[in-house]
A protein has these predicted regions:
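Catalytic-core segments of class I nucleotidyltransferases/pyrophosphorylases
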Residues: 39-130, 134
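Extended, small-residue-rich solenoid/repeat segments and analogous flexible loops
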Residues: 95-200, 208-213
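Generic beta-sheet signal
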Residues: 17-18, 41, 104, 318
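Short beta-strand-to-turn element immediately C-terminal to the catalytic PLP-Schiff-base lysine
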Residues: 30-33, 63-64, 115-116, 152, ...
Length: 342
C-alpha cells in the first residue's frame, strides 16, 4: 500500500521498493544521481567496484504504469554477464526517455531480503523465528533460550508456559497455559492441553490432555490421544491409541492400536502385540485394570474393567472384569543344581 501510494503521489512511471542492507552481497544495487534520483539498478555481477560499495539494494518489488512497462520491455536486451533479460533494465530505459523514476525505501530491510541460497533461507527463517518468539514472550510465555527454540508462526502457546532449549513446535500445533515443555522435544501437528509437562519427547499428530506428564524419552506416534492426568514415562512408545484419564504407562512399554480405559496401571516391560505378520489388531483394556510387569497382550484381546494380569503373562484370551489372569509356566526349583549338572 505504501509503495502504491508513493507511486501515485510522485506521478512516476515506475517506482521501486529499495532497502538499505547491512550486507548487500548478492543484491542488485540502486544507483542514484547526485540529485538523489534513481538512475539505474545494476546486478552485482555487472557492477563496478564502486557500485558494489552501495548499500541500497533492489528488493525486486515494483510499481509500474502498465503501458510504459510493456513499451520498455520491448527494448530490454541480454548483453550482460548472465546473458539474461533483466527487468530492472526497464528503469534505465524509462529514464533515458525522460520519464520519472521514483524509489521508496522499506521501513525494515528484513521485509525485503532475498532467498537465493540455503544460507539466505536460514537467515530469513531466523528472522521469522525471532519475531514469533518475541511475540510469545511479550504475551507471557517463558523461553529459556529463544535462540534455540523453534516455534512455527501459526502455533499458539498459552501464557505462563515455560519452554526449554532445543524444542520444536511446528505445523498445526497448539499449547495450553502453564505447561513445561522440553528440553530437546519436538511436537508436530499436536494439541497440548493445560499444565502439561513433557521433556525429551517426539509427538506427531497427537493430543495430550490437561495435567499429563510425558517423558523423558517418549515417542507419541500419529493418532495417539492421551486424556487428562495421564503419566507416560521413560522409554515408552504409543501409536494409534487412546489412553484414558489417569492411566499410568511409567516405563518401557509399546502400546499400539489400543483403547485403554481410565485408571489403568501398566507394569514395566508390558506391550500390546498388535501385528501377526499380515494384519494389525486392537487391544482393549478396561477401567482400573492392572497389568503386571513384562506382560504381552496378544491382540485382538480384551482385558475387562478392574481385571488383573499377573507379571510375566502372555495373554491370548479375553480376561473378564475383576478376574486375575495368569499365563506363565509354574516355577520349579531344583535343589543342589551345581552338583547335579556335573
Amino acid at each position: 500500500t505504501r509503495l502504491y501510494q508513493a507511486h501515485k503521489e510522485a506521478a512516476a512511471k515506475a517506482t521501486v521498493l529499495t532497502a538499505i542492507m547491512p550486507d548487500a552481497t548478492g543484491y542488485g544495487r540502486v544507483i542514484r544521481s547526485a540529485a538523489g534520483t534513481v538512475e539505474k539498478i545494476v546486478e552485482e555481477k555487472d557492477a563496478t567496484e564502486a557500485e558494489r560499495q552501495e548499500k541500497e539494494v533492489n528488493s525486486g518489488i515494483y510499481c509500474f504504469e502498465a503501458q510504459d512497462l510493456f513499451s520498455a520491455l520491448a527494448e530490454v536486451g541480454c548483453d550482460n554477464a548472465q546473458g539474461e533479460y533483466y527487468l530492472p533494465d526497464v528503469l534505465a530505459i524509462l529514464r533515458q526517455r525522460g520519464e520519472k523514476i521514483w524509489a521508496l525505501a522499506a521501513e525494515n530491510y528484513e521485509e525485503t531480503i532475498g532467498v537465493n541460497s540455503r544460507l539466505q533461507l536460514a537467515s530469513a527463517e531466523k528472522i521469522l523465528r525471532h519475531r514469533k518468539n518475541l511475540a510469545l514472550m511479550e504475551s507471557g510465555v517463558t523461553l529459556m533460550d529463544p535462540d534455540t527454540t523453534f516455534i512455527d508462526t501459526d502455533v499458539s502457546v498459552g501464557k505462563d508456559t515455560v519452554i526449554y532449549p532445543f524444542t520444536w513446535i511446528e505445523g498445526a500445533s497448539s499449547v495450553g497455559e502453564g505447561c513445561v515443555l522440553g528440553p530437546s522435544s519436538r511436537f508436530s501437528d499436536t494439541q497440548i492441553g493445560h499444565e502439561v509437562t513433557a521433556q525429551f519427547v517426539y509427538a506427531h499428530e497427537c493430543e495430550i490432555g490437561d495435567g499429563t506428564i510425558v517423558g523423558p524419552y517418549v515417542h507419541l506416534r500419529p493418532q495417539t490421544k492421551l486424556a487428562a492426568q495421564v503419566r507416560v514415562g521413560n522409554f515408552v512408545e504409543v501409536k494409534n491409541s487412546s489412553i484414558g484419564e489417569g492411566a499410568k504407562l511409567p516405563h518401557l512399554q509399546y502400546i499400539g492400536d489400543c483403547d485403554m480405559g481410565s485408571g489403568v496401571n501398566m507394569g514395566c516391560g508390558t506391550i500390546t502385540v498388535n501385528y501377526d505378520g499380515k494384519a494389525k489388531y486392537r487391544t482393549i483394556i478396561g477401567n482400573d485394570a492392572f497389568i503386571g510387569c513384562n506382560s504381552n497382550l496378544v491382540a485382538p484381546v480384551t482385558v475387562g474393567d478392574g481385571a488383573y494380569v499377573a507379571a510375566g503373562s502372555t495373554i491370548t484370551k479375553d480376561v473378564p472384569s475383576k478376574n486375575l489372569a495368569v499365563a506363565r509356566a509354574r516355577q520349579k526349583n531344583i535343589p543342589d543344581w551345581p552338583d547335579k549338572r556335573q
